């Protein structure tokens, strides 16, 4: 069992029940999934960029990504429906907890001028989205093999009903919020 999953079951659930006044253990919010997405507009001109991005995403998450395609054509961007424009990975269970643990303890501290993550990026339902400007903060990425710096989005989906519940859960998980 992942270290963070064990910590959640043994320490975080009782702490959240006491803190939020839950009567039933099933009311306690938990992580559902983590979606890591890399959108690549440059893939319209050069499809090889997509291959390197997929390899990097697979190295970061430990799971093979799905190539995302354009939903509709946009003439201004020279984009046709069905063209590959990015890649995404959905992590659940053990891999989800392991990824979040690595993100909090190893990757986020490697961000330049890091003062914590914003507490305002919740969606109103307790889910949190985080943007990473460069993939080099992950130790799995070899700096010499990177041809272009790419950003990625990380969405953490929880069962929390409100942003306050979601923030309390993620704070206990170790996410360093600024305010």
From Swiss-Prot:
Function: This is one of the proteins that bind and probably mediate the attachment of the 5S RNA into the large ribosomal subunit, where it forms part of the central protuberance. In the 70S ribosome it contacts protein S13 of the 30S subunit (bridge B1b), connecting the 2 subunits; this bridge is implicated in subunit movement. Contacts the P site tRNA; the 5S rRNA and some of its associated proteins might help stabilize positioning of ribosome-bound tRNAs.
Transmembrane segments: none
GO process terms (BP): translation
GO MF term set: rRNA binding; structural constituent of ribosome; tRNA binding
HAMAP family (UniProt xref): Ribosomal_uL5_B
Statement: the UniProt record of this protein carries the keyword Disulfide bond: no
PANTHER family: 60S RIBOSOMAL PROTEIN L11-RELATED
Protein name: Large ribosomal subunit protein uL5
Superkingdom of this protein's organism: Bacteria
Assembly: Part of the 50S ribosomal subunit; part of the 5S rRNA/L5/L18/L25 subcomplex. Contacts the 5S rRNA and the P site tRNA. Forms a bridge to the 30S subunit in the 70S ribosome.
UniProt entry keywords in alphabetical sequence: Ribonucleoprotein, Ribosomal protein, RNA-binding, rRNA-binding, tRNA-binding
Xref: InterPro entries: Ribosomal_uL5, Ribosomal_uL5_bac-type, Ribosomal_uL5_C, Ribosomal_uL5_CS, Ribosomal_uL5_dom_sf, Ribosomal_uL5_N
Family indicated by similarity: Belongs to the universal ribosomal protein uL5 family.
GO cellular component: ribonucleoprotein complex; ribosome
Gene3D superfamilies registered for this protein in UniProt: 3.30.1440.10
Pfam families in the record: Ribosomal_L5, Ribosomal_L5_C
């Amino acid at each position: 069992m992942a270290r963070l999953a064990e910590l959640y079951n043994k320490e975080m659930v009782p702490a959240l029940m006491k803190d939020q006044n839950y009567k039933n253990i099933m009311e306690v919010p938990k992580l559902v999934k983590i979606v890591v997405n890399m959108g690549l507009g440059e893939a319209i001109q050069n499809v090889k960029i997509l291959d390197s991005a997929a390899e990097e995403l697979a190295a970061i998450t430990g799971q093979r990504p799905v190539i995302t395609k354009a939903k509709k054509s946009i003439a201004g961007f020279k984009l046709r429906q069905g063209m590959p424009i990015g890649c995404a990975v959905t992590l659940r269970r053990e891999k989800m907890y392991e990824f979040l643990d690595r993100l909090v303890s190893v990757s986020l501290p490697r961000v330049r001028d890091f003062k914590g993550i914003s507490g305002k990026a919740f969606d109103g339902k307790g889910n949190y989205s985080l943007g990473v400007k460069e993939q080099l903060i992950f130790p799995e990425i070899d700096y010499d093999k990177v041809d272009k710096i790419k950003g990625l989005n990380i969405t953490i989906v929880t069962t929390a009903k409100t942003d306050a519940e979601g923030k309390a859960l993620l704070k206990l998980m170790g996410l360093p919020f600024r305010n």
